[in-house]
Amino acid sequence: MNSEEMNHVNPFEISDNNDVSIPSQRYPFANDPADSVFCADDFLQSYGEFNMDNFGESEPFIDASGAINAAIGVTGTVLGFLGVPFAGALTTFYQKLFGFLFPNNNTKQWEEFMKQVEALIDEKISDAVRNKAISELQGLVNNITLYTEALEEWLENKENPAVRDRVLQRWRILDGFFEQQMPSFAVKGFEVLLLVVYTQAANLHLLSLRDAYIYGAEWGLTPTNIDQNHTRLLRHSAEYTDHCVNWYNTGLKQLENSDAKSWFQYNRFRREMTLSVLDVIALFPAYDVKMYPIPTNFQLTREVYTDVIGKIGRNDSDHWYSANAPSFSNLESTLIRTPHVVDYIKKLKIFYATVDYYGIYGRSGKWVGHIITSATSANTTETRNYGTIVNHDSVELNFEGKNIYKTGSLPQGVPPYQIGYVTPIYFITRAVNFFTVSGSKTSVEKYYSKKDRYYSEGLPEEQGVFSTEQLPPNSIAEPEHIAYSHRLCHVTFISVSNGNKYSKDLPLFSWTHSSVDFDNYVYPTKITQLPATKGYNVSIVKEPGFIGGDIGKNNGQILGKYKVNVEDVSQKYRFRVRYATETEGELGIKIDGRTVNLYQYKKTKAPGDPLTYKAFDYLSFSTPVKFNNASSTIELFLQNKTSGTFYLAGIEIIPVKSNYEEELTLEEAKKAVSSLFTDARNALKIDVTDYQIDQAANLVECISGDLYAKEKIVLLRAVKFAKQLSQSQNLLSDPEFNNVNRENSWTASTSVAIIEGDPLYKGRAVQLSSARDENFPTYLYQKIDESTLKPYTRYQLRGFVEGSENLDVYLIRYGAAHVRMNVPYNLEIIDTSSPVNPCEEVDGLSHRSCNVFDRCKQSISVAPDANTGPDQIDGDPHAFSFHIDTGTVDSTENLGIWVAFKISELDGSAIFGNLELIEVGPLSGEALAQVQRKEEKWKQVLAKKRETTAQTVCSGEASQLTNSSQILKIRNYDLIQNFRIFSLRNTLSIKFKIYTITNYPYSRLNYDLFMELENRIQNASLYMTSNILQNGGFKSDVTSWETTANAEVQQIDGASVLVLSNWNASVAQSVNVQNDHGYVLRVTAKKEGIGNGYVTILDCANHIDTLTFSACRSDSDTSSNELTAYVTKTLEIFPDTEQIRIEIGETEGMFYVESVELIRMEN
């Protein structure tokens, strides 16, 4: 063929003639047929770029491989270490992380992050800003290196105080650095250019705050400081996230335009910033180890798109996005999928044609369209068509059960046949290799045209433009089929035809992260996260940028369903939902059609507000559930929902430990006790009531002493301290109704009963019956003395009423303030325990105090239609509150404050308790003026009455008073001498001698009994003298013991007995011991009423043992003759420290302790 003939060849002939036979070569460039036509120089002139490198290459003006490698490596490393790591894992984690961020302990990688964004948006960071950022980053490198070195040393040697102090010091320096220098990475005007630097620095800061929460207690941080650091972790997570999302959107918006080249840059920015910024911030919630204390299967379901498979040349005219390219909007709407559920490719059928240039010697295959079959996690399938799929040959690739972890593509710009004219006018995809893995087996599926002159057997596996150049693996230390970071999940396509000039057929590959699990496995040992896009029957909308994937939206009452595969059906789980909503309602969960959870949710944002980080919240379901089937369906639904949208980020399935209920009780108790105190922990919050403290104490007592002995002791001390604070501020005398109708207590009518053991009250409550008749009401009252009051001060009466009808409450000072309370008896006690009597047979006796409820297995249900009023606390109709104000305080007048309860009706009743009268604070403003007016009016009325009384006396109209002598009633008590043991021994010896003289010869029969008794007395004497506790028999009152209120020594039947009459009473003594000896703790005591009494012994190493006494318990370590008698219990201990502490307390009722002995064992 001569030159003239060649000039008549159609350079662009598209052929689908199956009869054309074209010889094939596997490696076309080894023996290019063009060389037989042209000399080398001619070939280079006409096909100047006809070599492997230029058939398809990366965009020449951006090289972000180093930055992307580091960003993907950071994300992959964090995903692998979520939860609370053990020491070795934490060291490995930081080593891997710093390998990506600080290779060679310098800032080179961070400079790459800056260059990456500069190239993406074609702007430059000023030298001043760059130099300052690099300087601060070098400081970060130095500080974080010192911290991690100290941390590693401490993890290996936690017992060394110097090492501990060093790591804490280094952490504080590093934390201060972050707090001070983070603004340097967000300089005004350069926020987008510094965005990747800011993101990675923020990530490190949050990781360091996570360390402080995990290890803070061991470093010596106070609980308050640990909580403050946790609060900062949450606050900075929101702050850093909102910053990153805001400036990501700003940078992306700046790249919007109308042409294809702008879209090319736009898509690259979106992809690379997703990898470097959005993926990182999506993991921030997982740093909260309160929420994620165990490994978590976190999934990034977002999709990223690699570059269009189109030729990129050396000149603008050689690029696919040059002349006759689709518009920006056309590319975006055609190539980028709308929000959808997660899917993966099952089959891909590619249709191809051939392009003839330079006759049959330049024939190439050309991808012109495809049919893609996708499957979802719900096993549903969908088929979509792209491009031209009729009248063309095709190749079908089956990817069932395979992950496509890499592609190698051959895009080509085909030039016309014309000497010296090398501008391509036809852009095609000539061949693609799909690299797959299934289990450990790898394979390569190939698309190619058998009619292709040079690639009739496909593209060699080592050639092409590889997807890993844009989506590198998580690590280079492992093979790509193991360490790959992304899977191919979809292929879109766009075609532009303009005759035979500048026509383009362009596929686009869509990828999801390798963390996505298509089978929805539910793991028994880690938290399973199911994003909203892993379900079906769910509406999917675009994510706000920080979730890690698109989110769900309710469709009416329907939120979606999830098909899951449960590894262990015997394991219990609980659910947690991350959501945002503008309304309130109930969220329910079904498993295989049965409702297992139904909880109320609260609104998280106002209508119209954007979906920010703080707009999302968690709804945690505490009730554990089981799956009945290995393959199950979870359904989420809404109930009682008003208008508004419910957004669903995802559902989390959390394995429940075998001791989950106990752990939940511990957390509830911690929360309840913490809520009682101000931030300083030394005072009660002003709105905390005595009833709330009692309920918190009930929660503490339900904590498992076997699992959480230390925590229980600490919380019990805290709640007792709260009770002491409550009692110290309570101006009422005898609020527990222990001494009604006695001095300094309440005065009550005979129809008032004191009740104990009511499930609603921890202490005693009072019951008022109806009036006997209209002249004899039921009443209860007391006066608070003037000496305890302050001038111009507001006081508040508070309490808890189980129910009342026609109950009048009076607060009296300047006249009577009267309120009638009618509170429904609508509190239902739900007992979840089996109704058994634990004392049906105890030594053949029964006891009414044993038939009691278990506070740890009860809940209180309140009717939802209960009316609330202005004098109720937090809208609870059963918690009441009334106030009264004082004016001037005059001890001579001694007005005081009278508190009275009265029922005058024949159909009245009331049960109430936890009464308290507390000081609220000084009066001011209108309240002050009002009490001054009231006091002045009262004084005028009083003066007038006194004047009238004086006139009456002077006129002789007053009745004569009869003075009768006062009769004093003196009770005589028989005083019984409390002999010591040696006195008892002497008395016994004398009596035995008299018995021997007077009863001989029968006395010999009792001699053995006498000797046995004498030996026992002698041994008891030895025990008494060897008791290392001071005043263990309470002969000297409570000397040597630390005591609180409601604990006193009484003389009962001639013995000194320690009596605890309230659950907050505490008696304790610390003693020195020898840690190379064993000791016997022996306690003689008895319990009356409900609840338990206990004697706890603990050492400085937090080893705790407890002897428990109950009115209905008979244990193996107990010696007793009858149920109500004193029992003696013993316990052997072997302390590890040189000091131990004995603590005596009770849960409720009365506890009597006759003696406490701690005796050292002899070898």
UniProtKB/Swiss-Prot annotation:
InterPro entries associated with the record: Cry1Ac-like_dom-VII, Cry_V, Galactose-bd-like_sf, Pest_crys, Pest_crys_dom-III, Pest_crys_dom_I, Pest_crys_N_sf, Pest_cryst_cen_dom_sf
Keywords in alphabetical order: Sporulation, Toxin, Virulence
Keyword Kinase, does the record have it?
A: no
Which Gene3D superfamilies does this UniProt record tie to the protein? Answer: Galactose-binding domain-like (2.60.120.260), Pesticidal crystal protein, central domain (2.100.10.10), Pesticidal crystal protein, N-terminal domain (1.20.190.10)
| GO molecular function list | signaling receptor binding; toxin activity
Per the record, the domain of life is Bacteria
Q: Which SUPFAM superfamilies match?
A: delta-Endotoxin (insectocide), middle domain, delta-Endotoxin (insectocide), N-terminal domain, Galactose-binding domain-like
GO terms classed as biological process: sporulation resulting in formation of a cellular spore; symbiont-mediated killing of host cell
What else the UniProt entry mentions is: Toxic segment of the protein is located in the N-terminus.
- Family statement drawn from the similarity comment of this UniProt entry: Belongs to the delta endotoxin family.
The record's PANTHER family line, in alphabetical order, gives: ENDOTOXIN_N DOMAIN-CONTAINING PROTEIN-RELATED (PTHR37003), PESTICIDAL CRYSTAL PROTEIN N-TERMINAL DOMAIN-CONTAINING PROTEIN (PTHR37003:SF2)
Its function, per the record, reads: Promotes colloidosmotic lysis by binding to the midgut epithelial cells of insects.
Indicate what this protein is called per its UniProt record.
Pesticidal crystal protein Cry26Aa
Q: Which organism is it from?
A: Bacillus thuringiensis subsp. finitimus
* Organism ancestry: Bacteria, Bacillati, Bacillota, Bacilli, Bacillales
